């Protein structure tokens, strides 16, 4: 199974990008041993439209164009579930074991995700009740994806 992250906005060079890449590399190394084919990242430019509804719509169209067929969609959204790491790992492991070709995680732009994308999602995930900048969300997501691999592998990184 491939893990895909589609993010509106680009991380500039700096500590957030370096940390995200470190978790991505760690996942790729460990994930291959667990039946994962890597972590793909697609960065999309933020819409330049004047109003929020148009920005959300344009970004949703760009996101939808990148979602592979037969994949499961996971939206990072403040209205999503506060899911613990072990439960997220178990869900990703189930999808892998069921032969799902890809789990696609989506990080929206400043205005959030379209209602259509949220409805289409198999799972909505929130990293707590706070609103986070997309740079931080990306680092948190990559860490949780790496943590998923460590949990599935029985690696001591995750100590609950």
Curated annotation (Swiss-Prot):
Specifically methylates the pseudouridine at position 1915 (m3Psi1915) in 23S rRNA. Belongs to the RNA methyltransferase RlmH family. It comes from Bradyrhizobium sp. (strain BTAi1 / ATCC BAA-1182). Transmembrane segments: none annotated. PANTHER family: METHYLTRANSFERASE (PTHR33603), RIBOSOMAL RNA LARGE SUBUNIT METHYLTRANSFERASE H (PTHR33603:SF1). The lineage of its organism: Bacteria, Pseudomonadati, Pseudomonadota, Alphaproteobacteria, Hyphomicrobiales. It catalyses: pseudouridine(1915) in 23S rRNA + S-adenosyl-L-methionine = N(3)-methylpseudouridine(1915) in 23S rRNA + S-adenosyl-L-homocysteine + H(+). The gene is rlmH. This is Ribosomal RNA large subunit methyltransferase H. GO terms for molecular function: rRNA (pseudouridine-N3-)-methyltransferase activity.
């Amino acid at each position: 199974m491939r893990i895909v992250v589609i993010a509106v906005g680009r991380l500039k060079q700096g500590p957030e990008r370096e940390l995200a890449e470190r978790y991505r590399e760690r996942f790729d190394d460990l994930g291959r041993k667990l039946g994962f084919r890597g972590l793909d990242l697609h960065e999309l430019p933020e819409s330049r439209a004047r109003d929020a509804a148009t920005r959300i719509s344009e970004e949703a169209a760009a996101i939808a164009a990148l979602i592979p067929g037969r994949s499961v969609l996971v939206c990072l959204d403040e209205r999503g579930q506060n899911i613990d790491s072990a439960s997220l790992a178990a869900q990703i492991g189930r999808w892998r074991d069921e032969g799902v070709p890809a789990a696609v995680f989506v990080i929206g732009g400043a205005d959030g995700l379209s209602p259509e994308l949220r409805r289409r999602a198999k799972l909505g995930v929130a990293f707590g009740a706070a609103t986070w900048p997309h740079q931080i969300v990306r680092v948190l997501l990559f860490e949780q994806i790496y943590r998923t691999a460590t949990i599935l592998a029985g690696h001591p990184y995750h100590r609950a």
